[in-house]
Structure formats: structure tokens, C-alpha cells
């Protein structure tokens, strides 16, 4: 199958006597909901996201997206869907000390000059998310979480 659980990207966290939405009332649930982004995880179906995910709040369902992506999603209160949609395909953005691009899946991808290593992952919408540690200090766009890199 291709569900988040089957791919290994998503997992459910369980605490005895704190099932379902009650998970956030447990110490572990409070930690997961406030700190998991620091480790590259997001709450896949946040309380504010039903209109974009189609799924009600599931505080126990987390997904690994990587540290820079999780930081942006958490700090800007985005769903994964809204985050992916915020990228103009083919453009490079600077955030959280990284350069990030969403590019069409094809025979080649465009990479920035002078990069050390990159993480290239499919985004499940027909594109790749490319993440490169930023070696230059790029300016952040005022009033937005990302800026285009020229």
C-alpha cells in the first residue's frame, strides 16, 4: 500500500488511558504536540487543518518531514498540504538555514551553485522537494516565511 503508515513516514503514538484526542492530555502527548517539530516531525492532522487535509484533529498521528520543513510548518501553523502548495515549482527558497525547492519529477533537477549535499524526496504530488544546507546567508522575505533565491 501507499498510506503514510505503510511507507514508514507516518506513525501513531499511543499512551495507555489517553486514546484519541485525549492523547494531548498526557505528558507524552503534550511533548509530542509542542516539541516533535524540533526532531523533524509534524502533527499530520492538526486542530486547525481539517479544511485542507479533510481529516479531523489527530494529535497522535505524526509524520517525518525533516527538521527545516517541520520548523516552518510548526512555526507558521501550516498543514503539509498548505506547505507544499506554498512553493512555486522550480524556484529556490531560503529558510531555517536551508535552500528548499519543489521541482517537477523528470530526468534532471536544478541545483544551486556550490552545495555540499542534498536531500531529494518525492512529495506525493508528482514533484520532488529538494533540501540543501544554505552556505550563503540569504535574506528572508519580510512578512513571509520564505524568499526566492536568485
Q: What name fits each language-model region?
A:
Residues 1-10:
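Short, surface-exposed glycine/acidic/tryptophan-bearing loops
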Residues 10-15, 42-45, 63:
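Structural recognition of the beta-strand scaffold that forms the well-ordered cores
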Residues 15-17, 66, 134:
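Short, flexible loop/turn elements at secondary-structure junctions
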Residues 20-43, 47:
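Long, well-ordered alpha-helical scaffolding segments within enzyme catalytic domains
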Residues 39-41, 58-60, 69, 126-128:
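A short pocket-lining beta-strand/turn micro-motif at the edge of beta-sheets
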Residues 47-68:
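Acidic helix/loop microenvironments that form the catalytic cleft of cell-wall polysaccharide enzymes
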Residues 68-141, 145-150:
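Low-complexity, Gly/Ser/Thr/Pro-rich intrinsically disordered linker/tail segments
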Amino acid at each position: 500500500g501507499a498510506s503514510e503508515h505503510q511507507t514508514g513516514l507516518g506513525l501513531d503514538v499511543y499512551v495507555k488511558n489517553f486514546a484519541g484526542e485525549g492523547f494531548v492530555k498526557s505528558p507524552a502527548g503534550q511533548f509530542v504536540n509542542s516539541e516533535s517539530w524540533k526532531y523533524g516531525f509534524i502533527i499530520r492532522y492538526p486542530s486547525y487543518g481539517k479544511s485542507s487535509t479533510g481529516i479531523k484533529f489527530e494529535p497522535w498521528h505524526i509524520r517525518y518531514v525533516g527538521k527545516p520543513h517541520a520548523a516552518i510548518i510548526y512555526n507558521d501553523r501550516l498543514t503539509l498540504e498548505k506547505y507544499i502548495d506554498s512553493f512555486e515549482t522550480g524556484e529556490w527558497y531560503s529558510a531555517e538555514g536551508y535552500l528548499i525547492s519543489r521541482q517537477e519529477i523528470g530526468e534532471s533537477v536544478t541545483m544551486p551553485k556550490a552545495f555540499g549535499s542534498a536531500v531529494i524526496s518525492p512529495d506525493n504530488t508528482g514533484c520532488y522537494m529538494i533540501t540543501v544546507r544554505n552556505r550563503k546567508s540569504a535574506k528572508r522575505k519580510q512578512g513571509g516565511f520564505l524568499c526566492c533565491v536568485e
